[in-house]
Structure formats: C-alpha cells, structure tokens
C-alpha cells in the first residue's frame, strides 16, 4: 500500500522595501559502467526501537558469490553484522536505479545479512534492515543506489500517518511572505511526520519512536520545484533520528524589485514494506 501526500509552499514577495536466528536477504541495486577500477561502498543501517546502528563495508576488486564484505566501520556493539554475497543480476530495468549516470547500467546484488547475538538479544519490532551501494569511477562519476529494506516484523500501515509543515497540527500548505531587498532572500522551512494528527517524534528511542523512524525511512520524496524562475528550493533531508523530515531552503531573487507569487510543490509517498 502507498499513500501519496502533497505539500505546497506559496512564496509571496512584497516589492516594497520473534528471534532472528536466520539472516536477512536484501536485494541491493547498483549502477555499473563496465570499469573494473570502480570502487564500491556498501552502507548498512539497522533500526530498532532502542537504537539506530550504521555500518560501512567494502568488497574486493572483483566481488564474487560467497564473498563476505569487509567491515570498515560499525556504530553498534561488536561484532559488526556479517554481509555475504549470495547472488547477483545485471542488465535489469534501469527504472530500478533512478538517477543513473549516462551510459551506466543497472543490476542488483543479493546479500545475506547476519546480525550478532548481542544485538539480537535486544530484538523487538519495529526492526528494519536498510542497505545501499555507492559506486565511484576513476573519472569522478559517482552513483548511490536506492535504499533496500528487509524485516521479519509485520507490515506497518501508513493510513494514520501524514506529512505537515507544522509540528503541532497537520498543515498541507504554507504561505511564506518575504520582503524584497534587491538581492537574494533566503528562508528555511521544515516538514514533519504526523500520526493521528500529532507529531510522530523519531527522536524517541522506544517503540513509539521506532515506528516513526520506520515510516520516515520508507518515504519516497520528490521536489517538483517552483513555477517562477526567481524562486528556488533546496531540500535537505534530516537524519532519521530527528523529528524533522526535511529542511526546505527557499531562495528568492528580488533584484527586479517586482511582486512575485510562486508555488512550490513537494511530493511525499508513504510506502509500506
């Protein structure tokens, strides 16, 4: 199930002045260009009610089935999870790798992620495993694939959740009035995840906060831009443990000293796993 949520920002310028005995199987999508010198970095995140742990892994130059990735860093208690390649596919539909550089193709690895007993002892739902791949070519071209997810917990319904401009109530539109200066005027607006009309606070390290982080992690976000050339917005994603989803940095070129009305649109899709 998916729920589509739209947020609008109207910018107005005034021109006056169970236990986890088995491993998780995760399909990780990646981009490739046939250059064996590319460097692959794999990012792993494990989210649970009491904590969020992140790790970085790398492979040998020629990643082969059966290889266990080398752990570079891990923020949780030792040992770091074991990540083993159990299969791969190439030349799949490029739609699975959004934003591919020109001339690159799309594929996916299937990894088995085995979590240590010490972390498993804290296991309770919501529990989510997230993994992605980042490829860097010698020529300086980089591509980070989409997040892949796995869990053994029941699906989380997104029906009670929404996205808002205000952390105190659900607000789908925002009127921003700015004063012209003859230069560039900048303003930052934040968005929030809501549940049943109230703030869903991902800073809480408990079951309630865990479900907020789960839903926030599964969001697909698109900025559709603004309908006037003088207005631009840069969305900055907050860490998953913050209560904000994005900071929208709005910039308005007021050099013309003329009134400007512009609408900026942002799409949030709340996905279920």
From Swiss-Prot:
The gene is yfcO. Keywords: Signal. Residues 1-21 form the signal peptide. This is Uncharacterized protein YfcO. Pfam families: DUF2544 (PF11245). Induction: Expression is negatively regulated by H-NS and subjected to cAMP receptor protein (CRP)-mediated catabolite repression. The operon is cryptic under classical laboratory conditions, but is functional when constitutively expressed. One of its GO terms (cellular component) is cytosol.
